[in-house]
A protein has these predicted regions:
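Short, structured interface segments
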Residues: 1-4
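Non-catalytic interaction-recognition regions
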Residues: 7-477
Length: 477
């Protein structure tokens, strides 16, 4: 395809994005990463890279415990714990767990709610029953949401597997053998300051439980050394609240002999504000005080959602204006670009009826200012695509498409492909004015065919650019 290249050929990039905990629907921040991450994957592939799209599923640790506690409380119609999860979806999932268990001959609510004689409810049988049934339900819901959003992950990686397979222990032992692990205050520490971190990190707490970074250490090693598609670049896409995480992760990269910012790249995305009627939208039908992917899709659909989230540099916060993005106006950027594509398809249909064939084109006749503007815009596409890949910047594709659509709409209004007779007043004009009008409105066959070829080139680039953003290119609107 025009603009595609192989300058990243021979590189395998692991692109991990969204990776929301299986404790609720995907919120608007995760939705932004879904749009940006999948678009970035498509752009990197168009630059010749092999890309592994990966979702890291945090099914180990405290968040899952809080999720299970919340479900048990909801099932008993009790108040959800202060640090628990709230929203109608918690009641829904609790009810589904009870029904599923019942179908399997288990009365979930009758199982013991305490773990020991001291009355510690801990990892009780009942909580474990809710956890083991609810997490796969949430996982399936997340997978369905991603599929509807046109994001296909190659790997769904479960954090738990790193512990079950012994990879966490092996990774820590490897660091220990090279002198990067020490014991202090009953805990096990990673000497990350040796590799530029601002402080050393606990990896096994004094109570014997692994700290969050223990899984991250093993996971990075897994990405680099796995049998199937090991990567030479591991790209992590994280939310704004993870900024403090960069130093420790780069230390992990360096400790294993890799080059920070080369073998590991961390991209930090900023906030998304959803606006309607000039006010911030903070409520969801299902999830309480957060806007979810389903809320956004219901309001404006997949095309407008993906385009609007990918068109702003993820280093900046973005306002999603639901009124604007639902409108059929030139102010709506996704409509403006898609309309250029639909217009070009309509030109094709009219040209076919008029018997104009590209084979008759004389491209030297693309000599008007409007022709020149479109040709110049088309010529920029390969460079834009390469820069978007190198800078991990999908928004460059969106901005380019808007510029190309602008040049095309102007061209469409100035030049005709299918000849049209001059009106009586127009035909009475004299000299250069009449000649210019005649060239614009009533071109001879070689010029009309050349314009048709230019029209089709625009159509091809817009369709290709929209595909990189995961957005459809309608042929009628």
């Amino acid at each position: 395809a025009f603009g595609h290249n192989d300058h990243l050929g021979g590189h395998t990039l692991n692109l991990e994005f969204v990776s929301a905990n299986p404790t609720g629907p995907i919120h608007i921040g995760g939705t932004r990463w879904a749009a940006v991450g999948d678009s970035m994957a498509r752009i990197l592939q168009a630059n010749g890279a092999e890309v592994v799209r990966e979702y890291y599923f945090n099914d180990h640790g405290e968040q899952i415990d809080r999720f299970a506690k919340s479900l048990v409380a909801a099932a008993h119609h009790e108040q959800v714990p202060a640090d628990g999860y709230k929203g109608a979806y918690i009641d829904e999932i609790a009810a589904r767990v009870i029904d599923e268990a019942k179908a399997d001959g288990v009365d979930a609510l009758a199982l013991p709610r305490v773990r020991d004689e001291q009355g510690d409810e801990g990892a009780s049988e009942q909580r474990e029953e809710f956890r083991k049934r609810a997490v796969p339900m949430m996982f399936a819901e997340i997978q369905d949401s991603m599929k509807e959003f046109r994001v296909d992950f190659d790997v769904w990686f479960h954090e738990n597997s790193l512990y079950e397979s012994g990879e966490v222990e092996r990774a820590i032992n490897e660091l220990r053998e090279q002198g990067d692990i020490f014991e202090k205050d009953g805990a096990t520490w990673f000497a990350s300051t040796k590799y530029g971190d601002d402080k050393d990190r606990v990896i096994i707490k004094s109570d014997g439980h692994a700290a969050y970074i223990a899984g991250d250490i093993a996971y990075y090693l897994n990405k680099r050394r796995r049998a199937d598609h090991p990567c030479d670049v591991a790209i992590y896409m994280l939310g704004a609240d993870h900024h403090g995480y960069i130093g420790r992760m780069m230390a992990v990269c360096a400790a294993f002999g890799d080059t920070p910012e080369v073998n590991m790249q961390i991209l930090i995305g900023q906030m998304v504000n959803v606006m309607k009627d000039g006010k911030a939208v903070r409520m969801s039908k299902r999830a309480g005080n957060v806007v979810t992917i389903d809320d956004l899709l219901e309001a404006i659909g997949v095309d407008a959602s993906r385009y609007s989230l990918a068109r702003t540099d993820y280093h900046q916060s973005v306002d999603i204006d639901l009124n604007l993005l639902a409108s059929h106006t030139n102010e709506n950027p996704v409509y403006y670009v898609q309309y250029a594509h639909a217009r070009s398809c309509n030109v094709d249909r009219n040209a076919e009826q008029a018997g104009i064939r590209i084979a008759d084109a004389d491209l030297s006749l693309l000599d008007t200012p409007a022709d020149g503007e479109v040709l110049a815009a088309l010529a920029m596409y390969p460079n834009v695509l390469q820069m978007a890949g190198d800078h991990r910047a999908p928004h460059r594709i969106a901005h380019y498409l808007e510029d190309l659509a602008s040049a095309y709409h102007k061209w469409y209004n100035a030049e005709r492909v299918v000849p049209m007779e001059l009106t009586d007043p127009e035909s009475r004009l004299k000299g250069e004015e009449r000649d210019a009008l005649s060239v614009a409105k009533n071109p001879e066959t070689p010029r009309a065919a050349a314009r048709l070829k230019l029209n089709d080139a625009v159509q091809h680039v817009i369709a290709g650019g929209l595909k990189l953003l995961g957005v459809s290119a309608p042929d009628k609107m």
